[in-house]
Amino acid sequence: MKEFMEKAKESNIKAFELKFGQGAKIRGGHLEGQKVNEKIASVRKVREGETINSPNRFSFISSAAEALYFIQDLQENGGKPVGMKIVIGQQKPLEDLLKAMKELNIYPDFITIDGSEGGSGATYKSMADSMGLPLIPALLTFIDTANHYGVRDKLKVFASGKLITPDKVAIALAIGADAVNSARGFMMASGCIMALQCNSGQCPSGVATTNPHYQKALDPYEKKWRVMNYVISMRYSLFSLAAAAGVKSPRHLTREHIVFKDEMGKVVPLSELFPSVIGK
């Protein structure tokens, strides 16, 4: 805890997120030794060139209550927002988590719902393609279950998982997310060509490498304009979609604004397929 408190004092650290699950890496993190340079080795407290395997769970947490007590400790000792990231799978663990929040009156400052679409060139394909629910059903499940247990208003819900384009972001907001995360969008704006070399240290665009030779491909002074344009275009397009739907802000989009079409051409509003759940 002492080390955590010291890091929390860093002005450039705005919040902490505990990764309890990630769509692309259910097995946990894996960093090849060829990417572990002197700086990374110093931060991670390993030898330079040593492969790092991060477990997919916290060894001292075995229940929803223990997870929440740990989050509470970090909130109290760090003085900064502490959130959690999860992947939705079976219904029971989700219900256990939400019930524990209500019973203990302990809530993370935010909770990120990651869909199985979350990608990485440094994971097992079998896991990336098959573990966890895709974002739309995952988000629907979480929002409705949180409403059922009467805790939705206590939570800030972030959505993540291939939210690259404005229409996908609009759907996530309409389902009930408060905000979205987009890693892939910013990576592609920075030059990622999805070469699937993330784990090798030989990323040809310089985005996912610590090798100085390959890093030359990424000029931050040039790429910053592309990233800026991506953000501006995303925001403009989101508000354009909202205006077309007759609302003042993307935050005002609801399930009534989303329509799905089946293979026979029949259209059904999302609000009819998945009516909003009223809390207890």
Language model segments and positions:
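Active-site-facing alpha/beta catalytic cores
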Residues: 1-100, 107
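A structural-propensity feature for long, helix-poor, extended segments
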Residues: 1-14, 19-23, 202, 206-226
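Short helix/loop capping segments that flank catalytic or ligand/cofactor-binding pockets
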Residues: 26-29, 121, 251
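Residue-level signal for pocket-adjacent positions within structured domains
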Residues: 38, 53, 198, 248, ...
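Short capping/connector residues at structural and topological boundaries
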Residues: 41, 45, 63, 203, ...
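Short coil/turn segments at secondary-structure junctions
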Residues: 51-58, 126, 218-225
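Glycine-rich phosphate/ribose-binding loops and adjacent secondary-structure elements
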Residues: 58-215
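C-terminal extensions of enzymes
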Residues: 191, 219-280
